[in-house]
Amino acid sequence: MYSNLFYHKYSKNIHSQNGEDGVIEELLKRLDISGGWVCEFGAWDGIYLSNTFRLVEQGFNAVFIEGDVTRYNDLLKTVEKHNITPINAYVDHNDTENSLDNLLSKTAIPVDFDVLSIDIDSYDYQVWKGLKVYQPKLVIIEINSSVNTNVEYINDSVKCMGTGFKPTYELGVEKGYTFVLHTGNMIFVRNELFHKLNIRYDNPLENFNTNWGGR
């Protein structure tokens, strides 16, 4: 099945914004993953527009990271009812105490955990690029979908912009991942797992879903 057809067939929102809940559920089903670990930041209360909270409701363990103190307090209310490890920190894209590798090392999450969702509206690209130790099976990363797929645009500020499709795709390849589909976010799977998905496309850089989020 072509990935855009896959998106429109399985797209479903329970907590997510652009159909990721249904898409991720089907991808994990094809990967034979029915439980495990997820990580998401900035998580806010862990529920609102989350790409992974539906999995938490289904029994997955989670590490949710939120830097804003008020929003972190909202997250703590969610933690009381679920298997969530909360972290109050802003993830740094440099090799510091608050790098994603260092923050995750203080938790029980395994190196090859199941789903990573990166959605911080700025240096998402740099955070994933800086992740060296942990190798999640699926990566969901927000991009600037208004940038043409052939433009090499990398956001280098904390403004709510995001990096374009092309450099994010290239980063995934560099890190050993295969691009699966675009929902407004880009979803990647580790190379050795892609064959299980039964998803195809002709040219990844042309596989930008112009109708993402029902647009």
Question: Which role does the model predict for each range below?
Answer:
Residues 1-7:
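Juxtamembrane luminal stem/stalk of type II transmembrane Golgi/ER carbohydrate-processing enzymes
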Residues 7-8, 133:
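Hydrophobic transmembrane signal anchors and adjacent membrane-proximal interface regions, especially
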Residues 8-103, 118, 145-148:
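SAM cofactor-binding core of SAM-dependent methyltransferases
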Residues 28, 104-107, 172, 176:
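Hydrophobic, Leu/Ile/Phe/Ala-enriched alpha-helical segments that form helix-helix packing faces
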Residues 33, 109-110:
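Helix N-cap/coil-helix junction residues
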Residues 37-40, 54-61, 111-118, 122-215:
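Conserved acidic-Pro-Pro-aromatic motif
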Residues 98-105, 127-132:
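Distinct, well-ordered alpha-helical segments
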